Amino acid sequence: MAENRMLTVFYQKFASYKLQLFSNRSKILGQEKTKQQICDKPRLQIGPIIVAVDTSESMYGQPEKIANSLLIQLVRMAKKQRRKCFLITFSVIAQTMDLAHPANWDKLKDFLDHGFSGGTNGEEMLKIALRVLETETYSLADILIISDFEFSKPIKNTIYKMCEERAMGVRFYGLQIGTASREYDKILDRIWKV
């Protein structure tokens, strides 16, 4: 029992360390997303976050605990920095939760209590993330995918849309639990291995 609690504390501290990438940027406000913007470098603006958590069977067990710890730390950080946060959970189907609304925070606890199972549909998750980017609230959001990345690369049309968003300043990040897959190393802007 004490060992499980210590492991959970370790995951939370480790998650906090890994998530510092979002809190180390300068605050520049009032930047609008336009088609003319071309960005080769990450924005300095601290904006909203879209986080996608892989809830497939391959994430069951220790990866699930790590993913949940990362998510808890990310939500805490978003609240502290007053950043809006949108959650996408994905396995065979994807589910969404807008954590910018405090009423949804209780639903987050329900999510954390469910086990991970099923296959993985990364394509659906990316399509949802791209649709959320079209909203005013989440325009220019950072996208963070927490996964083992054991799913197919996106189709060409999705990669094209990701490139369009990237040209406007959106950045796509990954926190990879395990090191089995390297499929997304060239698709995302940066992947940290956990």
Regions found by a protein language model. Give the residues of each.
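Conserved ATPase-coupling elements of RecA-like P-loop NTPase cores
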Residues: 62-64, 154-157
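Von Willebrand factor A/integrin I-like adhesion domains
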Residues: 102, 180-194
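Catalytic-core regions built around general acid/base machinery
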Residues: 74, 159-167, 172
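Acidic/polar low-complexity segments with low predicted structural confidence
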Residues: 1-46
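A generic secondary-structure signal
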Residues: 73-77, 128-135, 161
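Von Willebrand factor
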Residues: 44-101, 106-146, 150-153, 174-183
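Loop/turn elements at helix/coil->beta-strand transitions in domains of secreted/extracellular proteins
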Residues: 81-83, 139, 168-171
